[in-house]
């Protein structure tokens, strides 16, 4: 996959691209990340890419021409163009999975200041937000998208690792433990030490449902549960009512 990011702060992504899974994915050529400095597309002698808002208002707006000219240069018929904006649809694991599985070329536009000139909207395919709050710029949101999508690409991480992630199956992940087995009377649940894989699987399933019910009950509203999950969820609700 090729991911191209249009930004006025390309250096923001330097450490991000040199860290952890993203670094490994780049080295193994599972993904290419190309940064485009919006200022290089400015026709202003000072490389200015923002201006005041027509009709009055506070703050500065990123101009239309630099974005348009950059898109004209890098966009292909296979491109999916994404504008990061607080007005966009909330990004979730389903979006990440769809992008990873269906797209080969993503172009991410990072807004800043008061946003972007609305004329760019007719040249994008999706407007995405990472939450109902406002950030200084789209760069932080861009790293969220790139990380969430890249880890789902083939051979970036073991498939079983992300299949067990929270949200990947529509539920939160079960609690996990590591050594030591006991510390100041804080014990690892005995079932995880039993070696009984059937009981461990059942415990994890139940704890996953319990965590989802307690922390994100909204995820259960449209979730199609198996008969086993339905039975476990009933048990959990009865236990919590005691």
From Swiss-Prot:
Organism listed in the record: Onion yellows phytoplasma (strain OY-M)
Job description of the protein: Specifically methylates guanosine-37 in various tRNAs.
Cited InterPro entries: Alpha/beta_knot_MTases, tRNA_m1G_MeTrfase_C_sf, tRNA_m1G_MeTrfase_TrmD, tRNA_m1G_MTases_N, tRNA_MeTrfase_TRMD/TRM10
UniProt keyword annotations, A-Z: Cytoplasm, Methyltransferase, S-adenosyl-L-methionine, Transferase, tRNA processing
Species classification: Bacteria, Bacillati, Mycoplasmatota, Mollicutes, Acholeplasmatales
Subunit comment: Homodimer.
Designated name of the protein: tRNA (guanine-N(1)-)-methyltransferase
Location in the cell: Cytoplasm
EC number: 2.1.1.228
